[in-house]
Each structure stands twice: as C-alpha cells, then as structure tokens.
C-alpha cells in the first residue's frame, strides 16, 4: 500500500504532535513491510537548517509510529520541491485542504486537521538563503543500505549543491 501525507506550512510542529498525527491517520490502514509512506511538503525551504530540522522531525516521528506497529522495513520518503507527481500513484492521500487532492493520483482521499505550530519547539530561523550555495559537494561513506539518516544527508547535500554532487559508496 502506498500512502501519501501532505503537509502545508509545516512550521514548528513538534515530534510528539507529529507522532500522534501519524497514529491518527495511519492507525486504521492495513500497512505491512512492503507499504510505502510518502510525506509531501509544500513548503519552500530557503535555509538548510530549517530543512534539516523538518526532515529530522518527520523521519523520527513517522518511524517512531511505524516501529510501534512492528513495521521496521516500511519505506519512508519525504518529498520536497521538485518531484514527479505522476510516479506516486497513491492508495491513500491525506491532505489538510481538499484542493490539494486534485494534484495527485489517488484511490482514496481524506482531509485532516493539521496541528498548529508548537511555540515551545525550536523555531525556524530566518537569514540569507543557502540553497544551492556550493557549486560542487562531495560525500563519502557507505551507502550500501539506504536508511532514514542517509536520506536526510543526501537531501541536505542536494539542497546546498547547485551543479554537481559526488557521492562515494
């Protein structure tokens, strides 16, 4: 089963409120190890710090929920900025506003109440953009099994790189 959850203006949503939201949205679905969770962000990020914070919270809270259901190998992907909408083909799509539903191919649609930002969470920062700040970036490491941490690292590297991203395996 392929499930999409769209967030608009993610802001300072805390990990606890996100974990509860994932439980609320996914609790009635028959997920298994082959299921895929696609978290779709409509926000435009200008600072790598804000993107890193959002990715960390989303991967942590969604993985916490899946682990609580013994779904250790369920895939999680956070989609930001440019991605192919046609490749999604979702069984379920959860959106904060019905108007987002027409953008994606889905079998089932559900509108949910997105929690408000939590003022006690670390606030997103302002400052000069570091999007595509470096022409070339290089990463080394072992990427033989891509896990959530690797996805965050690769996303951040792609965010700050404008021309060439070199990844050693």
Annotate each PLM feature.
Residues 1-169:
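Nucleotidyltransferase catalytic core that binds NTPs
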